[in-house]
Amino acid sequence: MFNLRSLSLATDFIEGHLRYKRKQVSGPARVVAIGNFDGLHLGHLALLEELRMLQQTLAATGQGCLQTVLSFEPHPRVFFQPNQPPLKILPFGTKVLCLKELGLDELAILKFNRSLASMTPEEFVHQVLVDELNAKAIVVGEDFRFGSKRSGSIETLQQMGERLGFQVKAVASVMHQQERVSSSLLRDVLQVANLPAYKDLTGRDYELSGRVSYGRQLGRTLGFPTLNLAMPERLAIAGIFAVEVFGLQPSGPVRGVASLGRRPTVEQQGRNLLEVHLFDWNQTVYGQRVCVRLKSFIRSEQKFDDLETMRLQMLQDMAKARDFLQKTN
């Protein structure tokens, strides 16, 4: 069973210094992959494959361990550069579902705040990896740094592992077409809605998940009722797409056309929203959790002079989406 847990560190922050509280190590042993896992690209998948192999190796020696991913919320760059936060690749909930589908046992979330940013490498290892997670093996990327001012290196981690009884495995970066696969690269391809490139870099279609919420019913008055899903601010991708929606029926996905963005024709500085018009569907599904898979980019968002002009464009978008989805059946 997949477990999502939020770690609460036993520390006090007093006058700029951490007062560390040791606690008795308890709970199951773990193999732990550390990272932001922003976008879950091929490099992240290589880390998770190494995690599985380490778990199997330890299991063969009689050491049963949970496969755990240790990640951070918010992204550390949001904490250090609040005025220039990185574009989000996946909403948090979608990332959780993707990790669950990969067969992990556990996702542990550590709140990235002033206390965590001030931890020395030694405090992080002792309190988080040893005391809290009871780690027997750690998997990180080859450029991993940790602790206050990024003062801890892989060598630091390996030296502490020798003393404290855990293994450390550094995984090399994955290359694709002579370019390092990274979250920054994913953001670049998403900003131009290059869905084939995203699939090459992650091994899967781009998808978004959430609960269907009530909207303004504007689409219904125009003849295009929609499912509405709230999206996080600063999502890296926007536009009009042909989509498949999962979670509505057991027989498979329902096809449709989706608008992802701020709807500049109907709202000024509107909230980020995913609106999906389903083909051949007339059931009410408010509150239901769905997964929307983006299959093809149709066009960028644009502001129309009036609703009738927008409606005529939506008819063209629907026709293009239907045509694409029928050809790929």
Regions found by a protein language model. Name each.
Residues N3, D105-A108, Q167-K169, C291:
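Conserved beta-strand segments of alpha/beta enzyme cores
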Residues F2, G215-N329:
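Phosphate/ribose-recognition catalytic cores of enzymes acting on nucleotide-derived substrates
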Residues H41, L99, I138, Y198, ...:
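Residue-level signal for inorganic ion chemistry
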